A protein has these predicted regions:
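C-terminus-biased signal that marks the final domain/tail of proteins
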Residues: 1-135
Length: 135
């Protein structure tokens, strides 16, 4: 797990600071924004995956693609890093700039999380196809 905190005086008080949260290998995992005004997180954040495999756990939703990419990092790193940067750019550009309710902040966190899960799921499938005959 890794996180970055950012005090954001240029954002409305309802948004406030942002915790950019990631799991597994922080160099490979997406950052999910959690705002000071957030009151709910996606369900998968409450499921522990440290000692058992659970595909509904946030950890395992990113770990599978991360591990596959690591095995052949020389051939995956450029595309992988492009997807991380695109995800982070989209997440930053969508941060609410006006006064918003906690429900909107919750929905934005969920939206960024859902987009990241979909991207990492696509990468996992891509890597299984790429490496099906062996690593």
């Amino acid at each position: 797990m890794a996180d970055n905190y950012r005090a954001a005086n240029w954002l409305p008080d309802e948004v406030g600071g942002i915790c950019w949260f990631s799991v597994d290998n922080p160099g490979q995992s997406p950052r999910i924004p959690i705002f000071c005004g957030t009151t709910e997180l996606p369900e998968s954040f409450s499921i522990c995956g440290q000692k058992t495999y659970n595909p509904d756990c946030i950890l395992w939703q990113f770990r599978r693609a991360n591990r596959l990419a690591t095995i052949q990092w020389q051939s995956t790193k450029d595309g992988f890093n492009e997807k991380i940067l695109k995800h982070e750019e989209n997440a930053v550009n969508g941060i609410p700039q006006a006064a918003v309710s906690p429900a909107i902040l919750n929905a934005y966190t969920e939206y960024v999380y859902d987009q990241a899960v979909e991207t990492w799921k696509e990468m996992e499938g891509e890597y299984w196809v790429k490496f099906w005959a062996g690593f």
